[in-house]
Amino acid sequence: IFTDVDCGYCRKFHNEIQDFNDLGITVNYVAFPRSGLDSVSYNKIVTAWCSKDPKSVLTKMKQGQDVQLSICQNHPVEAHFLLGQKIGITGTPAIIKSNGELLPGYLPPEELLTRLN
């Protein structure tokens, strides 16, 4: 799932991640700061990726909590963003099925399960 820490529907999806997992849906995030590589959103998601506990920091950010920005050098965020652009991602969340099909936007857990099958 291509995600942005400042995307409202990405936050909704993240808050329901346990519901997706309970249905057997595995969620893997790919960073896609919609505002680009020279943005606060980019710095936020890099901070999460570079932290000692990325899941916890990402959750705090998606809950709107302030987190001290800290940028490291070895992270995949730029590569994720460029991949998203290359395959035509224009918004988030953007769900990529295992067969490569794009499901743009937020889908509730039960609907996503149906669309994945």
Whereabouts are the PLM-identified features?
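Short hydrophobic alpha-helical module
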Residues: 23-26, 51
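Thiol/selenol-based redox catalytic cores and closely related redox-interacting motifs
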Residues: 36-113
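Short active-site neighborhood of thiol/selenol oxidoreductases, capturing the structured segment around
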Residues: 1-8, 27
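Soluble periplasmic/extracytoplasmic beta-strand elements of cell-envelope proteins
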Residues: 26-29, 94-96
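Typically the conserved alpha-helix immediately C-terminal to a functionally engaged Cys/Sec
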Residues: 10-23
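Residue-level recognition of beta-strand->loop/alpha-helix junctions
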Residues: 31-33
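Short, solvent-exposed mixed-charge patches
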Residues: 116-117
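C-type cytochrome heme c attachment motif
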Residues: 5-12, 94
